[in-house]
């Protein structure tokens, strides 16, 4: 019974709360949907986690203060999202999404994806990088600190690790572990793979809806194609598909599989479309979320936004779009400057 309660808490904090909170930033979007609500909620949760974690690191606050702060912010956002959904009277199903008979191809894709979720969770790969990432989370939980103890030695840091401290994704793992009452290794190897692989396919489905807006069968075939490609991605240990299946609980893998594709999708809908599909706030949150996941995310998210900025200028000659895109790059640029200063 105790394990059932912990699993329900994991579902609450990793699915229900972000899903409800996503309605806050999507309340005015014409492209809102159940899947986008969850993705937007994660952008919000990761952004708050990044900001609060960095503040806690520099202020040397204990982990429980950070945990209660993030829980309060996300719970408030979830309540607000539910209220906004009730006011709009369309629940969380989105604006004008068609519901009808499910495509046979989509059912096949769903079965393939479900098998991947089971395989990733119950046949978990043990990775050497866990010696730092999972150990940092475990150390933080058991010492009630935030990036204060070196997981390799057990001694306090004399100098913060510049490579990791600005992207404290292990601290997010520690927060979730503390909130749900499960060991960080269990959360990383059993819970996170299910959630993040599911999110990766949600992002791919957003592309399918963009490319095949009126053809449900084509969307299903596209998802089958993606699932099969990912199943047979082990020809290299360096591609994003392999990262997705083998070590999705690590920030760099989650970045490559979920959040960079999501950032590109949002950038296309906001910067490269004449009629803006989502708010600029969502793009800003996406940049901050990439910063949380990995130090590479700080660089790659900024590079992607700059490329989209140039493409937007060429297409629309809009200084307003360029200025807004530049503002969305600010978190990456600021963290890049901080990295140069502390290394």
Language-model segments: which ranges?
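Membrane-embedded, hydrophobic transmembrane alpha-helices
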Residues: 1-96, 315, 333-340
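Membrane-interfacial entry segments at the cytosolic side of transmembrane helices
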Residues: 65, 94-106, 277-278, 317-329
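Specific aromatic-rich, kink-prone transmembrane helix
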Residues: 249-273
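Membrane-interface alpha helices of multi-pass inner-membrane proteins
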Residues: 279-295
């Amino acid at each position: 019974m105790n394990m059932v309660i912990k699993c329900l808490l994991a579902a609450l904090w990793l699915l229900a709360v972000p899903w409800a909170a996503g309605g806050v930033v999507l309340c005015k979007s014409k492209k809102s949907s159940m899947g986008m609500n969850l993705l937007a909620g994660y952008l919000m949760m990761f952004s708050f986690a990044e900001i609060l974690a960095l503040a806690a690191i520099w202020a040397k606050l204990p982990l429980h203060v950070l945990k209660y702060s993030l829980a309060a912010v996300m719970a408030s956002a979830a309540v607000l999202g539910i209220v906004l959904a009730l006011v709009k009277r369309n629940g969380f199903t989105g604006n004008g999404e068609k519901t009808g008979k499910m495509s046979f191809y989509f059912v096949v894709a769903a079965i393939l994806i479900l098998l991947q979720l089971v395989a990733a969770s119950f046949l978990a790969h043990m990775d050497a990088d866990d010696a730092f990432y999972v150990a940092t989370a475990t150390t933080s939980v058991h010492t009630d600190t935030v990036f204060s103890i070196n997981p390799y030695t057990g001694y306090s840091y004399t100098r913060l690790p510049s490579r990791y401290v600005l992207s404290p994704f292990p601290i997010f793992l520690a927060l979730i572990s503390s909130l749900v009452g499960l060991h960080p290794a269990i959360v990383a190897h059993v819970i996170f793979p299910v959630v993040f692989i599911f999110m990766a396919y949600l992002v791919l489905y957003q592309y399918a809806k963009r490319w095949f807006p009126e053809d449900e069968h084509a969307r299903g075939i596209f998802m089958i194609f993606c699932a099969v490609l990912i199943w047979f991605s082990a020809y290299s240990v360096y591609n994003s598909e392999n990262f997705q299946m083998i070590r999705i609980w690590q920030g760099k893998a989650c970045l490559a599989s979920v959040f960079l594709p999501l950032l590109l999708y949002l950038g296309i809908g906001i910067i490269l479309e004449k009629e803006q599909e989502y708010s600029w706030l969502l793009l800003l949150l996406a940049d901050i979320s990439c910063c949380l996941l990995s130090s590479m995310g700080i660089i790659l998210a900024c590079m992607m936004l700059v490329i989209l900025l140039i493409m937007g200028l060429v297409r629309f000659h809009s200084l307003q779009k360029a200025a807004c895109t530049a503002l969305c790059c600010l978190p990456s640029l600021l963290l890049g400057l901080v990295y140069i200063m502390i290394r």
